[in-house]
């Protein structure tokens, strides 16, 4: 006798696209660097942190506060992600698993607002902004001084109120994915 297993149902399966490769980023402002920051875009993969780590075994961080812009262009077609009429009723979500400290998200010109992300996950319904073909995702990552509206985590380097270096990198420091459900 033979054992038969059912075929995987593709129609209702959750689809995930990793958006970790080929980002462009640059700093628009950075404390302590006084104009010495990157003014031209560099290409990076996610996770990325603008705050460098220095010293023996790279345990001492640079305490970098500032703002960085991240841009990613990605192309979607039906064979990749089922966006057209064949996927009627599906919802599409961008999931950010860590952006330090605040993230302002724009997809194809639609502003999704500023969010206190930090070390938490942010999920946005982008169904109405996503399209077949080329899509442009822009993330403004901000890590200002004196953060007062986020949980404080001692980075081990200061007792100053609102001081969160060591706990919040400047950048997109965890995965970003697009999901269809």
Name every feature range the model reports, one short phrase each.
Residues 1-37:
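Hydrophobic alpha-helical membrane-insertion signals
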Residues 5-10, 24-29, 60, 65-66, ...:
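Accessory beta-strand-rich segments of carbohydrate-active enzymes
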Residues 19, 42-44, 112:
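Disulfide-rich extracellular domains of secreted proteins
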Residues 40-42, 79:
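Generic short amphipathic/hydrophobic targeting helices enriched at N-termini
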């Amino acid at each position: 006798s033979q054992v038969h297993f059912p075929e995987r149902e593709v129609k209702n399966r959750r689809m995930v696209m990793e958006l970790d490769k080929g980002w462009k980023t640059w700093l628009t402002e950075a404390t302590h660097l006084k104009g010495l920051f990157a003014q031209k875009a560099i290409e990076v993969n996610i996770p990325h942190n603008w705050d460098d780590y220095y010293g023996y075994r790279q345990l001492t961080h640079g305490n970098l506060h500032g703002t960085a812009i991240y841009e990613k262009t990605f192309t979607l077609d039906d064979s990749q992600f089922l966006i057209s009429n064949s996927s009627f009723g599906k919802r599409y979500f961008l999931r950010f698993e860590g952006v330090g400290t605040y993230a302002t998200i724009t997809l194809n010109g639609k502003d999704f607002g500023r969010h206190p992300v930090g070390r938490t996950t942010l999920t946005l319904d982008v169904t109405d902004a996503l399209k077949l073909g080329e899509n442009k995702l822009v993330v403004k990552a901000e890590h200002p001084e004196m953060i007062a509206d986020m949980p404080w985590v001692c980075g081990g380097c200061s007792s100053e109120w609102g001081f969160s270096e060591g706990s919040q990198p400047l950048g997109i420091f965890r995965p970003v994915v697009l999901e269809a459900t």
